[in-house]
C-alpha cells in the first residue's frame, strides 16, 4: 500500500471510529517511512462524498431544533456539531493528499499531519 491508497481508504471509511483508526495507523506508518509516495500515480478517481455511516440521516442544520448551551441537550448538540467538524476536517486533509498529485513531499507530510491532528481532536470529543 502507498500513501495515495491509504488516503483513498480513509476517505471511503464509513464508520467514524474506523476512519480515525485508519488515519492514525497510516499517519504513523507515513512518519515511520513505511507508507511511501508512489513514484508515478494515475489521476485520482472522483470521490463525490467521503464515507459516512448510514445513520443518522444527514439533514440541513436549518431542519434541526435550536438548542441553547444552557441545557444538557444543547451542550450535547454543540459537541456533536464539533465532532462533525472534526470528522470533515479529517476528510478534507485526506482529500488534499489524495487529489493533488506531483506536488512536493512536504505538502503530503503536512496534510497527513493535519489528518492525524484532526483524528485526535475527534477522539477528544
Enumerate the predicted regions with their spans.
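Non-heme di-metal
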Residues: 1-125
Amino acid at each position: 500500500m502507498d500513501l495515495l491508497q491509504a488516503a483513498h481508504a480513509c476517505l471511503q471509511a464509513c464508520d467514524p471510529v474506523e476512519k480515525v483508526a485508519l488515519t492514525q495507523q497510516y499517519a504513523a506508518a507515513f512518519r515511520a517511512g513505511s507508507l511511501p509516495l508512489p513514484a508515478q500515480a494515475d489521476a485520482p478517481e472522483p470521490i463525490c462524498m467521503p464515507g459516512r455511516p448510514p445513520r443518522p440521516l444527514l439533514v440541513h442544520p436549518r431542519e434541526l431544533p435550536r438548542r441553547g448551551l444552557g441545557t444538557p441537550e444543547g451542550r450535547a448538540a454543540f459537541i456533536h456539531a464539533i465532532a462533525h467538524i472534526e470528522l470533515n476536517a479529517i476528510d478534507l486533509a485526506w482529500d488534499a493528499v489524495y487529489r493533488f498529485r506531483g506536488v512536493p513531499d512536504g505538502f503530503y507530510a503536512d496534510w497527513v499531519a493535519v489528518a492525524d491532528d484532526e483524528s485526535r481532536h475527534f477522539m477528544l470529543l
